[in-house]
């Protein structure tokens, strides 16, 4: 048994390897689960509900993220190497595809449990930002999802730990640590939601929709720095999806408040 036999492998037992990519996803998912449990208990729901929900939504999200990635990388990679489709330990999870798949699963799950969708969304979505922030570190260990080339002096100006600077030296050049930009951005959005939006929200569902606004803004700007964007013709797919998320979030809050005014 070896811990960290390579920088991107957490544990090796014989032929079994546990990659840091998986560890980061598991840590993020666990934190999101615990935050969700805390919020559900405050709302008076049984902890068993989220336990039943968690595994299903996690698997659905991972499958959706993989399918999204494979679709847009089909010609470049998977058409000629179909055996790589299941090799998620090599990276290649497009989080926006996972979000969409998880939303569909969540809608039907909570409908079956007779729990209002926006109530569940407010309880769960802030924690998703923590999961995403942790998951981005998996990209760091996999040397993927990095940005365009920059100078060493630029990275030093950011006052980054040396191990991050060292691992941003990829393919003969230093690169923007876009994984870190998005990770920090997601944490900031999380804090804004729980410290500001939660206190000032006029309607149930505003935290849910604020997630899409905040995450959409962060991802749109970070994506502009990346070199590995999934493309739809000349358009960066993640930026297009981010715009859709932002519009949906703003429209959702507007509709909720408008509906509230009509009721009162």
Regions found by a protein language model. Give the residues of each.
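Hydrophobic, membrane-interfacing alpha helices
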Residues: 1-264
């Amino acid at each position: 048994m070896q811990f960290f036999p390579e920088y991107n492998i957490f544990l090796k037992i014989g032929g079994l390897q546990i990659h840091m990519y998986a560890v980061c996803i598991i840590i993020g998912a666990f934190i999101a689960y615990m935050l969700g449990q805390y919020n559900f208990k405050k709302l008076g729901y049984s902890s068993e509900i989220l336990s039943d929900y968690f595994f299903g939504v996690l698997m659905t999200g991972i499958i959706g993220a993989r399918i999204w990635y494979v679709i847009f990388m089909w010609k470049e990679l998977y058409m000629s190497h179909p055996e790589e489709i299941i090799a998620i330990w090599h990276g290649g999870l497009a989080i926006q595809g996972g979000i969409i798949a998880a939303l569909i699963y969540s809608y039907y799950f909570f409908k079956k449990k007779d729990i209002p969708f926006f109530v569940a969304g407010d309880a769960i979505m802030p924690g998703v930002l923590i999961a995403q922030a942790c998951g981005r570190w998996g990209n760091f260990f996999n040397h993927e999802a990095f940005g365009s080339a920059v100078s060493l002096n630029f990275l030093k100006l950011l006052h980054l730990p040396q191990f991050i600077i060292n691992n941003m030296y990829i393919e003969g050049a230093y690169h923007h640590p876009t994984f870190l930009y998005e990770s920090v951005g997601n944490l900031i959005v999380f804090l804004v939601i729980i410290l500001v939006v939660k206190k000032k929200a006029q309607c149930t569902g505003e935290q849910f929709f604020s997630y899409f606004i905040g995450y959409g803004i962060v991802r749109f700007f970070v994506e502009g720095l990346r070199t590995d964007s999934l493309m739809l013709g000349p358009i960066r797919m993640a930026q297009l999806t981010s715009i859709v998320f932002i519009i949906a979030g703003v429209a959702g809050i507007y509709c909720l408040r408008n509906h509230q005014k009509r009721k009162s």
